[in-house]
């Protein structure tokens, strides 16, 4: 399926020197602790909580509308500690997701309306289907598909998943154009 052009109003997005496109309607708390490595798209009404701990996002990632990215935490007898969140390259996070993972590898697709529980680890080349709720501290192995509530193994991905995700995220970035450039 060929992706059509996705047009956006240039005044509604900030484009950084490294090619990141961040919606002015998104909320980046503690922006000094948020690292976007380049050509990443953060769409409207997203929230990234860099005020809690460092958040690193790789290259060619897409975070769609109304998603929340926040670092994981652990409760101790003396309080709560937050830990850094690392997201790899070529990761696609659909609309209305809440991500509270410890780590998301590269070439990962998270479907619409998902909840990624506290301190989950999503390895490289995995897929989370729409409406999935992963319980805290779940580990999703490479080349697997998880779905349901609670999220459980439901299938495998082909060996070419890495190439497919590179293709999807790069083409999405190339087709995400300002209205004036058409």
UniProtKB/Swiss-Prot annotation:
The keyword Cytoplasm applies. SUPFAM superfamilies: Trimeric LpxA-like enzymes (SSF51161). Keywords: Acetylation, Centromere, Chromosome, Cytoplasm, Cytoskeleton, Kinetochore. It is found in: Cytoplasm, Cytoskeleton; Chromosome, Centromere, Kinetochore. GO terms for biological process: aorta development; coronary vasculature development; ventricular septum development. One of its GO terms (cellular component) is nucleoplasm. Pfam families: DCTN5. The keyword Acetylation applies. InterPro entries: DCTN5, Trimer_LpxA-like_sf. The modification N-acetylmethionine is found at residue 1. PANTHER family: DYNACTIN SUBUNIT 5. Belongs to the dynactin subunits 5/6 family. Dynactin subunit 5 subfamily. Part of the dynactin complex that activates the molecular motor dynein for ultra-processive transport along microtubules. Subunit of dynactin, a multiprotein complex part of a tripartite complex with dynein and a adapter, such as BICDL1, BICD2 or HOOK3. The dynactin complex is built around ACTR1A/ACTB filament and consists of an actin-related filament composed of a shoulder domain, a pointed end and a barbed end. Its length is defined by its flexible shoulder domain. The soulder is composed of 2 DCTN1 subunits, 4 DCTN2 and 2 DCTN3. The 4 DCNT2 (via N-terminus) bind the ACTR1A filament and act as molecular rulers to determine the length. The pointed end is important for binding dynein-dynactin cargo adapters. This is Dynactin subunit 5.
């Amino acid at each position: 399926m060929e992706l059509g052009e996705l047009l956006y109003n240039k005044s509604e997005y900030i484009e950084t020197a490294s090619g990141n496109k961040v919606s002015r309607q998104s909320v980046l708390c503690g922006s000094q602790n948020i690292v976007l490595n380049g050509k990443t798209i953060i769409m409207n009404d997203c929230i990234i909580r860099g005020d809690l701990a460092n958040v690193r996002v790789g290259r060619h990632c897409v975070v769609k509308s109304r998603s929340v990215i926040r670092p994981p935490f652990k409760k101790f007898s003396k309080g709560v500690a937050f830990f850094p969140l690392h997201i790899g390259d070529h990761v696609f996070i659909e609309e209305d997701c809440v991500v509270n993972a410890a780590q998301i590898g590269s070439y990962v697709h998270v479907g619409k309306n998902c909840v990624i529980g506290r301190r989950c680890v999503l390895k490289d080349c995995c897929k989370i289907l729409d409406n999935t709720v992963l319980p805290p501290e779940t580990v999703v192995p490479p080349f697997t598909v998880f779905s349901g509530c609670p999220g459980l193994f439901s299938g495998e991905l082909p060996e070419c998943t890495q190439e497919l995700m590179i293709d999807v995220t790069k083409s999405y970035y190339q087709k995400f154009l300002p209205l004036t450039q058409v």
